[in-house]
């Protein structure tokens, strides 16, 4: 709640010393500037679903809409005056943030037989590729979707880091971001394997039972792996955006 309460526009968000650092950081992204490409992507997904009859196309469009919500909430928090309102929006933002990096796991839907090796009569081998255009279209939609969604997630994490208390040392700021990445890893596990949604937090008893019942070495390692991957993507994003 304390972090969300400080989430405001860049200028009043930090004192002059921190503002100097932010000039080297990531420039704010307006939803209006990115809604066009995302709408084109969603339309392509829906078109794929209609042409092929594959409901995965509609699912990708829906997932992209969910991935955009954290950025929308981030901008809403900057305009929200009451601290209680910013705190509530911040909590919803945290619950929805895993939806961004979740789309990376949609890559499991890549068609299995895109490339194979075939033995020829003369004893040599040849590499064959799928001649089905729908499979290549799906591969493109999955890759572009994962890329767009990961960028949205990294921008949301950048907004979080930029509005942490300016007095915090760099290790503390990175630890806070890493903690959020860990929560994202947990959210991705809940969504991909247990099929929970962000709003299932309204049923905490059922959620807790499912989580405890599925606890294993695999789930712990998966969450840790996703958290490290998200944190690595974010650090690369920050480095490239300077």
What residues fall within each predicted segment?
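N-terminal membrane topogenic signal
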Residues: 24-37, 172
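Central hydrophobic cores of alpha-helical transmembrane segments in multi-pass inner-membrane proteins
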Residues: 63-79
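Short, hydrophobic transmembrane alpha-helix segments
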Residues: 47-58, 77-81
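Hydrophobic alpha-helical membrane-insertion segments
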Residues: 89-104, 176-191
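Transmembrane alpha-helical segments in integral membrane proteins
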Residues: 142-165, 225-242
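Membrane-interface transmembrane-helix boundary segments in multi-pass integral membrane proteins
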Residues: 56-61, 207-230
């Amino acid at each position: 709640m304390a972090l969300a309460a400080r989430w405001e526009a860049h200028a009043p968000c930090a004192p002059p010393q921190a503002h100097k650092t932010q000039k080297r950081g990531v420039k704010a992204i307006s939803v209006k500037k990115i809604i066009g490409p995302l709408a084109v992507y969603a339309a392509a997904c829906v078109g794929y679903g209609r042409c092929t009859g594959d409901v995965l196309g509609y699912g990708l469009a829906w997932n992209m809409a969910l991935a955009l919500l954290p950025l929308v909430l981030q901008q809403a928090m900057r305009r929200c005056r009451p601290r209680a309102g910013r705190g509530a929006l911040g909590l919803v933002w945290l619950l929805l943030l895993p939806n961004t990096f979740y789309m990376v796991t949609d890559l499991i839907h890549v068609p299995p037989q895109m490339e194979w090796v075939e033995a020829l009569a003369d004893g040599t081998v040849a590499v064959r590729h799928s001649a089905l255009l729908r499979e290549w279209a799906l591969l493109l939609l999955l890759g572009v979707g994962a890329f767009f969604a990961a960028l949205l997630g990294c921008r949301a994490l950048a907004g979080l880091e930029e509005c942490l208390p300016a007095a915090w040392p760099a290790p503390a700021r990175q630890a806070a971001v890493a903690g959020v990445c860990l929560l994202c890893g947990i959210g991705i596990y809940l969504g991909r394997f247990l099929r929970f949604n962000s709003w299932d937090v309204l049923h905490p008893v059922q959620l807790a039972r499912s989580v405890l019942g599925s606890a294993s070495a695999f789930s712990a390692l998966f969450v840790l792996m996703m958290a490290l991957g998200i944190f690595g993507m974010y650090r690369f994003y920050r480095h490239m955006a300077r």
